[in-house]
Regions:
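C-terminal structural segments of small proteins and small subunits
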Residues: 50-76
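N-terminal first-folded block
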Residues: 1-27, 32, 36-37
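Conserved functional hotspots at enzyme active or ligand-binding sites that engage polyanionic ligands
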Residues: 1-2, 44, 55
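Short, charge-rich, low-complexity interaction segments located
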Residues: 31-45, 49
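Compositionally biased, low-complexity repeat tracts
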Residues: 24-25, 45, 52
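Residues that cap or flank secondary-structure elements
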Residues: 4, 49-50
Length: 76
């Protein structure tokens, strides 16, 4: 199992898009992504400049998306 990498919000959003998610809308500094096959799933990614997404938030986003750390590394 791979440790969670340090990743910026922009890179995380691109990785989630490669996994099939799309940006539904942006509210302030938060991007809301949805998946066409799973309409009940809504993922919010904080995008505050070039800062990396904190590990706890990244772990929660991966859990919501149904991805593992290894899958995220492949999508980056």
């Amino acid at each position: 199992m791979t440790d969670l990498p340090s990743v910026s919000a922009a890179r995380l959003i691109r990785a989630l898009q490669r996994a099939g998610f799309f940006v539904h809308h942006v509210t302030g500094g938060h991007y809301v992504l949805k998946h066409p096959d799973r309409p009940a799933v809504r993922i919010v990614v904080p995008h505050h400049g070039s800062a990396d997404v904190k590990r706890g938030i990244l772990r929660a986003i991966l859990r919501q998306a149904g991805l593992t750390a290894d899958e995220l590394v492949r999508l980056l």
